[in-house]
Amino acid sequence: MVQATDQEVNNAIEKVHIPPLKTQGIKTKLVPWIARYAAVDVDTVWVEPFMGSGVVGFNLAPKRAIFSDTNIHLIDFYRAIQNGELTAAGCRKFLESEGARLKSRGGDYFYEVRNRFNDSHDPHDFLFLNRSCFNGLMRFNRQHRYNVPYGHNDNRFSKAYVTNIVN
């Protein structure tokens, strides 16, 4: 196993980039440590069998990577980014608009969006739910319907928060 030096890790990962989705067990704090022990070079194909938020693979930034996960909505979300369906500007506009509705209508609006997502599986709605649900959970019932409750923060999507998400 090839181990990177501390200086190589610091040069490669000056700042850990936070992904747009919250997930349980996110490895943000472990990225520098993982980078130290994971040899990623031009010949490396990074394989991430349990993608989760993708924070490790995205920060290591290999030339070639295979990301997988059992959560199809997670995969569809990142595919939508990859194919240009989801953009930073589009997500900003969507989250600001939906955030204003959440602020005025509260939990009822959250559950309306949750029902809409369960019918359409729109990646914009997936992002909204992930950031406004209880504790950033991703949970689906046996019918494969998103069933996480509302996080009870009607003013969730402040401009600063939206900027953090889309950057």
Name each region found by the language model.
Residues 63-167:
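Class I S-adenosyl-L-methionine-dependent methyltransferase module
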Residues 2-50, 55-56, 60:
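S-adenosyl-L-methionine
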